[in-house]
C-alpha cells in the first residue's frame, strides 16, 4: 500500500493506492489507469487538505465526514484509510492543537485541530464524537449506495 503522493516512480511495486483525497481527484486519470490493471484505490487525509476538500478536522462542517461515504461511492473508491482514532499527544479536552511529533518538524509546525483523534478518552473507555458518528453515518450511506448501484447499475 502506498499512502504518499509518489506515483510514477512506484510503477508496478504496489497494488493498493491510497492518495490524499485531493491528490486522487487532481490525478484521477492516473489512478483509474492503475485500477484497470487490477489495483485498488482508497483515499485518506492527513494534516491536509483544507479549504473546499473533505477532511475531519475540528473546524470543518460535520457533513463533510458524511460526504466521505458519498464520495467513495460516487468515485468508486474502495474506502477511506483512517488515521488518528486516538493518537493523543496531549489531553484533547484541554489542547486540540499539538506540535508535530516529527523530529524534522520546525518549532512552529503544529497538527490541525483534531487531526490526532476522532474519539476521546473516557473514564470507562472511549467516548464518541460528532465527527466519529458523522463518519459512521457516511460509511453506512456508502454501503447503501453500493447496494443500490448493484441493483440498478445504470
Language model segments and positions:
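Catalytic-core regions of glycoside hydrolase
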Residues: 1-94
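Catalytic domains of carbohydrate-active enzymes that cleave complex glycans
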Residues: 1-6, 77, 93-154
